[in-house]
Amino acid sequence: MWFRQLALFRLPPDARPDLAKLEAGMEQHCFAPPSGLEWSSQGFVAPAGHAPDRLLHPLAGGALATLKREDKVLPAAVIRDVLESKVADIEAREARPVGRKEKRELKEQVTDDLLPRAFTKTGRTRALLDVQAGWILVDAAGQKAEALVSALREALPPFPARLPHTQLSPGSAMTGWLAGEVPDGFELDCDCELKSPGDDGATVRCSKQDLTAPEVRQHLDTGKVVTRLGLVWQERIRFVLTEQLELKRLQFLDVLEEQASQAGDDAPALFDATATLMLGELRHLVADLIAALGGETEA
């Protein structure tokens, strides 16, 4: 249930979505497995097993959403083996070579024949919609995070979620924090990555190391900048901040897990307690992090 990473998308104050309208739109984009000749499909599914009819699971000040994607897996070697067999059969039966164009057409035919029987690979991407604070918090990064936001946009256009921009770039801020003082509420953890400027610059990765040690600081003296930095927030959440303002290796510490477990052994109650607690904690963490980066800018 606990998120393991975080991508941030901003919802403008004057464009916070109506969750009832959003859920109605999501119902038009429910997940369905890819049909015979489709390579993949995606759509929304219920985030909570105990509420199978709800595509948005309501929480205090927000909701939880899940996008499911299914991809068919058809190895190129399988297609090649079947194609070679067909080509050999034609050449033996008709005593003629099979040309390039015909091979291409045969390959398309073989692919179409095999696709309905292909294995599938399934994945889910979850997001917290923090309507109260105006954030979409996605448990993914890169294309997967963008795909979920795009799916929400299709469900309720225009859904103007965007990547946030801060006064200080994460890279320059992290470099300053490693060289000097970390903002209130945060402390250095034990991992970081530093790079020399330029596309071909050297990269240094420190793991399970005291980041205040002289051998770490000397990399800053040579002009390297921090591109990833391990931080702990309020002794409650551990994470690695990246220069893209993504939170990797997100870990909710024991105090939060113990707090959630007070809901008891009832699975639905534990799910709801965990999701509600997670949304509240991430809401405060993101607010503190954005403030530490000097606040937001328009672009």
From Swiss-Prot:
Primary localization class, coarse: cytoplasm
Keyword Cytoplasm: yes
Subcellular location: Cytoplasm, Nucleoid
Signal peptide span: none
Pfam families per record: RdgC
Cellular component annotations (GO), alphabetically ordered: bacterial nucleoid; cytoplasm
UniProtKB keywords: Cytoplasm, DNA recombination
Alphabetized GO MF terms: double-stranded DNA binding
Listed InterPro entries: RdgC (IPR007476)
GO biological process: DNA recombination; regulation of DNA recombination
NCBIfam families reported in the protein's UniProt record: PRK00321.1-5
Family of this protein: Belongs to the RdgC family.
PANTHER family: RECOMBINATION-ASSOCIATED PROTEIN RDGC (PTHR38103:SF1)
Function: May be involved in recombination.
Record-given protein name: Recombination-associated protein RdgC
Lineage: Bacteria, Pseudomonadati, Pseudomonadota, Betaproteobacteria, Neisseriales
Gene symbol of the encoding locus: rdgC
